[in-house]
């Protein structure tokens, strides 16, 4: 693996931003030396260098909250790295999902973030099936009931659009999306599977490859 483009600082370190590949949420800011970066690329597991312990730090080594690394990005100056990960549990030692859980300025959440969080909640409900949970109730009712609900919600979306009612359309479309996410989770698919398919269909094409995106 060629790390010649990485500009480590005078202590042999480079800052690493850890980002949830599903939601885009920033999880952690840590540091890596050459060995940690090499191990991350080799194992596809987040590995850092602890400045306090002066040793490699493998995320989840003691907590079990590992991070599968799906992509490693280097910034334009070569002096910062991004790990895009699929986290298995919270990133923060406090038990919070992200180390950046204290807002100084609260902002709007984008669609990718919200979809990722809703899907994660659905998966957790399907795993634990808590009493009183709508997801658990629909799961027990069976796939046919979920699919019937999708049909009902799709009809509501059509009616809202037909009536040119943006507010109603917004709510009905959200209901439809929720039940689509529930269906994906029931069948073992993820929003990333949809994103991959959409990207394959619509990504910019080279003028030399003989094909064109939609």
Swiss-Prot record:
Keywords: Amino-acid biosynthesis, ATP-binding, Cytoplasm, Histidine biosynthesis, Hydrolase, Multifunctional enzyme, Nucleotide-binding. This is Histidine biosynthesis bifunctional protein HisIE. In the N-terminal section; belongs to the PRA-CH family. In the C-terminal section; belongs to the PRA-PH family. The keyword Transcription regulation does not apply. One of its GO terms (molecular function) is phosphoribosyl-ATP diphosphatase activity. The keyword Transferase does not apply. GO terms for cellular component: cytoplasm. One of its GO terms (biological process) is L-histidine biosynthetic process. Residues 1-114 are annotated as: Phosphoribosyl-AMP cyclohydrolase. It catalyses: 1-(5-phospho-beta-D-ribosyl)-ATP + H2O = 1-(5-phospho-beta-D-ribosyl)-5'-AMP + diphosphate + H(+); 1-(5-phospho-beta-D-ribosyl)-5'-AMP + H2O = 1-(5-phospho-beta-D-ribosyl)-5-[(5-phospho-beta-D-ribosylamino)methylideneamino]imidazole-4-carboxamide. Its EC number is 3.5.4.19, 3.6.1.31. Residues 115-214 are annotated as: Phosphoribosyl-ATP pyrophosphohydrolase. InterPro entries: His_synth_HisIE (IPR023019), HisE (IPR008179), PRA-CH (IPR026660), PRib-ATP_PPHydrolase-like (IPR021130), PRib_AMP_CycHydrolase_dom (IPR002496), PRib_AMP_CycHydrolase_sf (IPR038019). It comes from Thermus thermophilus (strain ATCC BAA-163 / DSM 7039 / HB27).
